[in-house]
């Protein structure tokens, strides 16, 4: 009977866990729909910003301005990279499968790749899980910020990028990249690595689909060429981080929805297995009792 009680308790415990994981799946599904819509709208803005860059650079080229002096731009093919800053984005919470682990693995892989080329690497972290991992393993993270990946905010992203841009413009770093998990569809996330500084022509032109960017830039930019490019570059860099945060959040909800769905299904399977074990143990107990009763009857004859 003690065995039956134990199995019954396990079944009850698993059923409670199943209810929790199912509820978390529903919450993540709801949040994912909202995050997906925000990511879609933000992508449209990002593509528009790329189109503005292309338009301005095209106008400058038509005017015979080939040599861009803006401090944000470099000829990537000729640039000698000695110092790289990696901005990584992870979640503030767990229970999302390999979402955080995959990002951390990519950061470590990129770090090792750069170090093999004698390139100095500095990390800047957004997200509690990533920051905790590197702190626990004794890996220095220059700037740490939590509660931003879970609630993307443009002003906070802008503030975070100020120090990054200052270090780049002062020569403390030669290149800045962002590594994060991106949203591909409801069931798929992919690791994305994007160079945001320096800005090169290959980075600017993202080959948007014709139906994604329908408007063209018709207004003439005012100010000097460098002023125009500096102003656009600041927006480009800031929004690159903000969009990465939005993209990462959508991917996080997608990963958590999948993880909770898997956990719910596993709980269902475990309940079935435990129920079979319970019924088997119950049948054995009944059989044992019947045998004992029959033995007692035979003894009284």
Curated annotation (Swiss-Prot):
GO terms for biological process: proton motive force-driven plasma membrane ATP synthesis. Pfam families: ATP-synt. It comes from the Bacteria. Transmembrane segments: none annotated. It is a peripheral membrane protein. GO terms for molecular function: ATP binding; proton-transporting ATP synthase activity, rotational mechanism. Keywords: ATP synthesis, Cell inner membrane, Cell membrane, CF(1), Hydrogen ion transport, Ion transport, Membrane, Transport. It is found in: Cell inner membrane. GO terms for cellular component: plasma membrane; proton-transporting ATP synthase complex. Disulfide bonds: none annotated. Belongs to the ATPase gamma chain family. PANTHER family: ATP SYNTHASE GAMMA CHAIN (PTHR11693), ATP SYNTHASE SUBUNIT GAMMA, MITOCHONDRIAL (PTHR11693:SF22). F-type ATPases have 2 components, CF(1) - the catalytic core - and CF(0) - the membrane proton channel. CF(1) has five subunits: alpha(3), beta(3), gamma(1), delta(1), epsilon(1). CF(0) has three main subunits: a, b and c. Produces ATP from ADP in the presence of a proton gradient across the membrane. The gamma chain is believed to be important in regulating ATPase activity and the flow of protons through the CF(0) complex. This is ATP synthase gamma chain. It comes from Helicobacter pylori (strain P12). The gene is atpG.
């Amino acid at each position: 009977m003690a065995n039956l009680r134990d199995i019954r308790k396990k079944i009850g415990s698993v059923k409670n866990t199943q209810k929790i994981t199912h509820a978390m799946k529903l919450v993540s599904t709801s949040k994912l729909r909202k995050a997906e819509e925000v990511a879609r709208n933000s992508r449209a803005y990002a593509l528009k910003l790329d189109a503005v860059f292309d338009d301005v650079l095209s106008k400058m080229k038509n005017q015979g301005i080939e040599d861009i002096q803006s401090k944000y731009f470099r000829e990537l093919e000729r640039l000698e990279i000695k110092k790289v800053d990696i901005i990584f984005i992870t979640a503030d919470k767990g229970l999302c499968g390999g979402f955080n682990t995959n990002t951390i693995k990519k950061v470590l892989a990129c770090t090792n790749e750069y170090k093999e080329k004698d390139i100095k690497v500095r990390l800047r972290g957004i997200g509690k899980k990533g920051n905790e991992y590197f702190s626990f393993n004794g890996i220095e993270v220059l700037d740490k910020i939590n509660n931003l990946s879970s609630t993307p905010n443009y002003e906070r992203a802008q503030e975070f990028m100020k120090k990054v841009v200052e270090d780049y413009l002062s020569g403390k770093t030669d290149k800045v990249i962002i590594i994060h998990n991106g949203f591909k569809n409801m069931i798929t996330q992919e690791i994305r690595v994007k160079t945001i500084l320096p800005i090169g022509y290959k980075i600017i032109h993202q080959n948007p689909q014709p139906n994604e960017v329908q408007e063209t830039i018709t207004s003439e930019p005012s100010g000097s060429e460098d002023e125009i490019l500096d102003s656009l570059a600041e927006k480009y860099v800031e929004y690159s981080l903000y969009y990465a945060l939005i993209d990462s959040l959508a991917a996080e909800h997608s990963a958590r929805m999948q993880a909770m769905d898997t956990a719910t299904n596993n709980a269902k399977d475990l309940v079935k297995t435990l129920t079979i074990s319970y019924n088997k143990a119950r049948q054995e107990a009944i059989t044992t009792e019947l045998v004992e009763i029959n033995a007692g009857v035979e003894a009284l004859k």
